[in-house]
């Protein structure tokens, strides 16, 4: 997408959602690369939505991060369910900004806050159907209760941390999504950045809105 299109897209967002005031500068939401094959798609999706975004390796020192309005922890080949390790993601989760974990990032988030991820009894690769629970929370706002998503994982979250709730489930994976809305922590087992996820763009739009609201709320004051 060309720069002019990105500017138009940002203007469209401001028109569609008045709470999005990008006149004083774009939101800054970076993507931590945990080795996932689709990390660049997450970056491209954010750019498409008018966000100032960069891809950073997961060994980036937390003090070298920019002043961020939000952060995405990408998926990756790391077996978080076996090792419990994922670069410097533990330090990133200490930041007082909204964070979205995708696949391995989601699994690591669960373990960091006291939940558990382990090897999945039924690994998923390809399209799957998920069902939202109680509307799915703010990350799924404006999407239907049943939707198709793209899966690619050997491990899965089996216990959510205290303070989190399950927001989406499927027949083969109980915890397809989780959130702690008070802490602005969101996890997705599936890959919303892949075209096969029907409402992936809407999910990214919702995360951008969450970051905007956090910036205007107590966190950003």
What are these regions (language model features)?
Residues 86-102, 107-202, 206-210:
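Pocket-forming structural segment of enzyme catalytic cores
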